[in-house]
Amino acid sequence: MPVGRSRAKGILLLGVLGTAVSAILVRYSQAPSLVTATYRLGWTVLLLLPAALLRGGAEWKRVTRRDVGLCALSGVCLALHFALWFESLKWTSVASSTALVSTEVIFVALGFALLFGGRISRLGWGAIALAVAGSTVLAFAGGGAGGTVGGNGLALAGAAAVAAYTLIGRYQREHLSTTVYTALTYTACLITLLVLDGVTGTAVWGWPPREWLIGLGLAVFCTLMGHSLFSWCLRELSPAYVSAAKLCEPVFAAVLAGILFGEIPDPAEWISGGMVLAGVLLYTYTER
């Protein structure tokens, strides 16, 4: 096996572990979900924006109003994802929430087919049907592990929101670098969260240092050690391999939740969650 691929697989594992920790950190937070999301994006922008301004160079001069508008829309979708998913973790089990939010791939597939004329094979439709069936069962399961229909519904809505973010990003990344795209999108996401804080009357200031540290952990582990590492791994590994590896996130998160919070999924959650992950994995296989 080439050294590059071996290294990439090790880094990919770190990325999966980083994203798995995010659900645990959100569960530890005692602040409102919007505050946790705002702190995460605040730290992310603070850490990434200076480097983006320096590395973007002349590309910033080529950014159009349309680019800014689409990146702003992408940021709004990402903000909704964080707000919805973080809130779901307060109402349902970590296992259910992370499994349901992984259906992002399915929402992306459907959106790509409906909006961009993308084609889905018969096997792909079968995979989508399996994931939808599993999601439906899982949404009403989990009573033994603190799951609620509302919390599971929020996780699914969060998956749909991040799928919209992904679809816009797929279009924008054709002519914008990762540096410029993420800088614009994350900034728009932070602004959106601050607006939501204001509209809902959520106090951003006055929370103890613990909450700021949780936000910093989310920015470092999930954004810098998670999504950014996934992007780096695509230089050595196939998108299908990376997507399949990301499905380990709900498994790792569920194990950590079992150890730290005593959350043990009941049989219905195990079966339906397995159906969801199997459907997503099967669809990923059809896209290889």
What are these regions (language model features)?
Residues 29, 36, 40, 88, ...:
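Hydrophobic/aromatic residues within transmembrane alpha-helices
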Residues 1-17, 44-73, 86, 116-126, ...:
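Membrane-interface interhelical linkers
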Residues 35-46, 86-119, 158, 239-258:
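Specific alpha-helical transmembrane segments that line the substrate/conduction pathway
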Residues 1-3, 41, 52, 140-141, ...:
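C-terminal-most transmembrane helix of multi-pass membrane proteins
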Residues 48, 72, 111, 120-141, ...:
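Hydrophobic transmembrane alpha-helices of multi-pass small-molecule transport proteins
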Residues 97-103, 168-190, 223-259:
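Helix-helix packing/entry segments at the starts of transmembrane helices
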Residues 1-39, 44, 76, 80, ...:
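Glycine-/small-residue-enriched transmembrane alpha-helix faces in small-molecule transporters
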Residues 31-80, 107, 111, 130, ...:
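Transmembrane alpha-helices of multi-pass small-molecule transport proteins
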